[in-house]
Amino acid sequence: MAVTTSMSFNLMASFRGMSLSSSSSSSFFKGEFGPSSLRLPNKSPLSVSPFPLTIESAHKKGAGSTKNGRDSKGQRLGVKIYGDQVAKPGAIIIRQRGTKFHPGKNVGIGKDHTIFALIDGLVKFEKYGPDKKKVSVYPREIQPENPNSYRARKRENFRLQREKKKARREGYSFQPQLILASAATDNADESAVC
């Protein structure tokens, strides 16, 4: 009951400003529109807009489709073994789409442009032409270690600690001995060169 009264009140409010007198009605039906023939109604706060409030878009899947907003997972492309790192035979060096990197020495290329190592060695990235890059694998050359390097000194220090600990467990007191590398001679003056 209350709904029908409010709707009738809205209709009355929308037609309040229109007047259809005998003089203006004939001109209205003839198609003559003027300021005297048609007066627009005053806007009231209770009036209903002529268009429904719907949001439309040009495409069927624009707003709230369940098929929207999805993305495929990443393809895990890129460099897998970097320069100056060791690669074993068959190890994948680069996964790529197209040939961003071209194969060099001792590497192969798969049908999906994956570059892989053919031999055991170090990976090197090289320039190839003005704007291309080439990947090669070179055999690893093992260089002798410097005895004065930090790694060698540290290894020797840990070896001495293990020997001391082992000697303590056995009850033997370990005393490091100094050994001179020079030959033992009776006359030190004869061998000295000044």
UniProtKB/Swiss-Prot annotation:
One of its GO terms (molecular function) is structural constituent of ribosome. One of its GO terms (biological process) is translation. The keyword ATP-binding does not apply. It is found in: Plastid, Chloroplast. The keyword Chloroplast applies. Pfam families: Ribosomal_L27 (PF01016). InterPro entries: Ribosomal_bL27, Ribosomal_bL27_CS. Keywords: Chloroplast, Plastid, Ribonucleoprotein, Ribosomal protein, Transit peptide. Residues 1-57 form a transit peptide. One of its GO terms (cellular component) is ribonucleoprotein complex. It comes from the Eukaryota. Residues 57-76 are annotated as: Disordered. Belongs to the bacterial ribosomal protein bL27 family. HAMAP family: Ribosomal_bL27. NCBIfam families: L27 (TIGR00062). Component of the chloroplast large ribosomal subunit (LSU). Mature 70S chloroplast ribosomes of higher plants consist of a small (30S) and a large (50S) subunit. The 30S small subunit contains 1 molecule of ribosomal RNA (16S rRNA) and 24 different proteins. The 50S large subunit contains 3 rRNA molecules (23S, 5S and 4.5S rRNA) and 33 different proteins. Component of the chloroplast ribosome (chloro-ribosome), a dedicated translation machinery responsible for the synthesis of chloroplast genome-encoded proteins, including proteins of the transcription and translation machinery and components of the photosynthetic apparatus. This is Large ribosomal subunit protein bL27c. It comes from Spinacia oleracea.
